[in-house]
């Protein structure tokens, strides 16, 4: 544990924003391969660090990421190791005030130069992708809990420009470790911590009117979810589901989950169904969560004793838990994960060893659905012709590539 994290733990109730606890962790190696054998199999991506000007991002935790068909976007993060975080070249040490993209087609990392004001709350913020726009809310700087945010920053990844949304209404407190989802044109924000107390507050930002509203559910206080941070949320358009999370001294169970009903404005408690032989997933916080239609996938995290390396699927219609036949090569927490529209999940960074306070910069991918024939053919083509992106648009069209595939090369 770093001195900053120890200070944070001892000084207040609120949790750390990017790692730090006690326990053990495991690590391993990763293999590769293409085709249907990739389903439920982690593949480590080394990138192309030999290309000039294309170093990979340093190891970090507490960052967030999103993905489209073409890129993985990684924002922010924290690493108390002075050398690993860039040494004298990093003016924001131990934070990373930077935006990276990993280009799937070429395997190249690129630190994006942007205009406008990039937020300084760089640990345990919330991040969603809305069209070409990254929407960033909340987060904290250093010391954790002393410089929190409650603004919504927008970065258009096409024009590489940051802007601040001008919002009215009852906005959330300055928090970090909250969870956020984009549902029917509105941002919903639940939970988090100020650094002193944990929250059960639920807020909604209408992106058409730019008005914040604090939602007041029709429940007794005893029926509300427990206060928490570093949880994840999923939704089906009618309900928002709260998955895990905790405080600096506990992690919440996944046997039962709370769901906020958007139609009735009330919290409900839903009993999930265990895996037939294994039971329920372990309680956890600081895990990752991605969603494909009605299937929700949680990965990694910390249960108060060990760093977890498992991956589970929850169906939002049956509430059945299924443990996938895959184990993370590096069990992590305070990592980030995102899924592409095609169903491939990417996992980056996180804390891999608590005692040594060690972070990783590793990037892994895993197909959560059977890849389509188009995706299989695309991966085969990129493997056979790694310099395809260097050809002109005219040459690519002449080779028979569609406009959609050509866009994924740029």
From Swiss-Prot:
The gene is Klhdc10. Component of a CRL2 E3 ubiquitin-protein ligase complex, also named ECS (Elongin BC-CUL2/5-SOCS-box protein) complex, composed of CUL2, Elongin BC (ELOB and ELOC), RBX1 and substrate-specific adapter KLHDC10. Interacts (via the 6 Kelch repeats) with PPP5C. It comes from the Eukaryota. InterPro entries: Gal_Oxase/kelch_b-propeller (IPR011043), Kelch-typ_b-propeller (IPR015915), Kelch_1 (IPR006652), KLHDC10 (IPR052125). Pfam families: Kelch_4 (PF13418), Kelch_KLHDC2_KLHL20_DRC7 (PF24681). Residues 15-36 have a biased composition (Gly residues). One of its GO terms (biological process) is rescue of stalled ribosome. This is Kelch domain-containing protein 10. The lineage of its organism: Eukaryota, Metazoa, Chordata, Craniata, Vertebrata.
